[in-house]
Amino acid sequence: MSDNRSHIEEKYQWDLTTVFATDELWETEVVELTQAIDNAKGFSGHLLDSSQSLLEITEVELDLSRRLEKVYVYASMKNDQDTTVAKYQEFQAKATALYAKFSETFSFYEPELLQLSESDYQSFLLEMPDLQKYDHFFEKIFANKPHVLSQNEEELLAGASEIFGAAGETFEILDNADMVFPVVKNAKGEEVELTHGNFISLMESSDRTVRKEAYQAMYSTYEQFQHTYAKTLQTNVKSQNFKARVHHYQSARQSALSANFIPEEVYETLIKTVNHHLPLLHRYMKLRQKVLGLDDLKMYDVYTPLSQMDMSFTYDEALKKSEEVLAIFGEVYSERVHRAFTERWIDVHVNKGKRSGAYSGGSYDTNAFMLLNWQDTLDNLYTLVHETGHSLHSTFTRENQPYVYGDYSIFLAEIASTTNENILTETLLKEVKDDKNRFAILNHYLDGFKGTIFRQTQFAEFEHAIHVADQEGQVLTSEYLNNLYAELNEKYYGLTKEDNHFIQYEWARIPHFYYNYYVFQYATGFAAANYLAERIVNGNPEDKEAYLNYLKAGNSDYPLNVIAKAGVDMTSADYLDAAFRVFEERLVELENLVAKGVHND
């Protein structure tokens, strides 16, 4: 690993020449695409002239969108690999501007399409059978018809989009640019400025004094700005409720979930079922208290790992282990994994200027690339199989669907990645016999479950409560938000709000509350993945085949129908109950290891 990208071996860098062989070819495509988008301006007002025009304009729009995605992928990934290079900052800005131009040019498309009556649409299908392959694409647009206003009204609302988004943007600037946190001490006794970036690592410290100081420094700062954060959050909630109301939805939640055709019962079932199983989280908190040897568990004690042992994997060892684990899906899946690992789909190591974190990206006509910032840890092995899950989902979808259905809903995205993580856990627990290593694996799993199912559902419950409160005329003051959040936190963790005063301000630092009913999908996805992984590892070949069909389906059907074919009914609590059974089994094993004194070895 080197700070300088030029020193990193080529085999550890993604190969973006498979997208565009040279920067010059990218620039040529941008010029040609700009011209093609300009040429499309004449389509406005003519979409429904005939069945032929509907087909031609639809296909031009999809073709330009497809080319634009490829242009954007190249620019954004070139920029992500080293954000200090001005040339690629400019490339990304050009690609973003081109997206805006494309959106503006085709803004007529949906309003005009919605003027088409059902009888005329059926006549068009008879006249032009080639339209049939777009039937589901059109159907999803038509389903939105009761919620689309007149063209003038929609243009008026579109013109106010920056105003509606201002609360979220204000939060981002306040939280990321203006907020300054105190200086605290790390585990080495060194003074460091507290930041969003180092907060979690400080909270994971084995030194309780370090954790407590970081926790109090973080939340006492939010306490000072609680009234401003309450106003930005209230404004965002009011914006969502207003937009839902004028578009004839009963609530902001109904509006948000309808975008993915998700019934509200999925959300309700999640909250109800998680609440039913909260005693399991309380039990895990008690075990955590015992392992840490504390008289009284505080909120600053819930992130530190219970195991000081970290199983180590070099990147090449992680590739080998991942291929072994994912072979369970069969030959076709394994062959694609091998290609991803050997044909330079992955940008592996940290380098100066590289975007932090990890993701899977790409477009319909490119490889499903992955960005990593590799460290030799168990956590990074999980990251590798997670991102490989996303990339294989994209690959299977693109190989089996036309471009129009060649992507998938956010609601389904996390299932493929976390199924891989859960299969890794199942496999490691089958293979690893050493008590200390089993302890580390179980701790990793239980903390992941805590952070994804329990915590994200707590967020989802809070998010819905504040939208309902605003609808009912409640002013979302900081006092109201603090009390609501403190009560929810006490209910979830079983730790009294009196003893954990500062946690009442946590709502102020959560960006997801500006994402409009997004967080619940983390919890539903993780639970579905738990359920599917167990079926794949312990079930029959039909279960694997059903799962691969889900990966292939893309947007060819509604999300709930796609995942139902894999064996999960997400309107029922069964998949959630099954996930909690796995959680309890693993909690019992960890409790037994603690009873044996493994944590003290």
From Swiss-Prot:
It is an enzyme of class 3 (hydrolase). It is found in: Cytoplasm. Its cofactor is Zn(2+). CDD domains: M3B_PepF. GO terms for cellular component: cytoplasm. The keyword Ribonucleoprotein does not apply. GO terms for molecular function: metal ion binding; metalloendopeptidase activity. Zn(2+) binds at residues 386, 390, 393. SUPFAM superfamilies: Metalloproteases ('zincins'), catalytic domain (SSF55486). One of its GO terms (biological process) is peptide metabolic process. The keyword Protease applies. Its main location: cytoplasm. Binds 1 zinc ion. Has oligopeptidase activity and degrades a variety of small bioactive peptides, including bradykinin, neurotensin, and peptide fragments of substance P and adrenocorticotropin. Also hydrolyzes the synthetic collagen-like substrate N-(3-[2-furyl]acryloyl)-Leu-Gly-Pro-Ala (FALGPA). This is Group B oligopeptidase PepB.
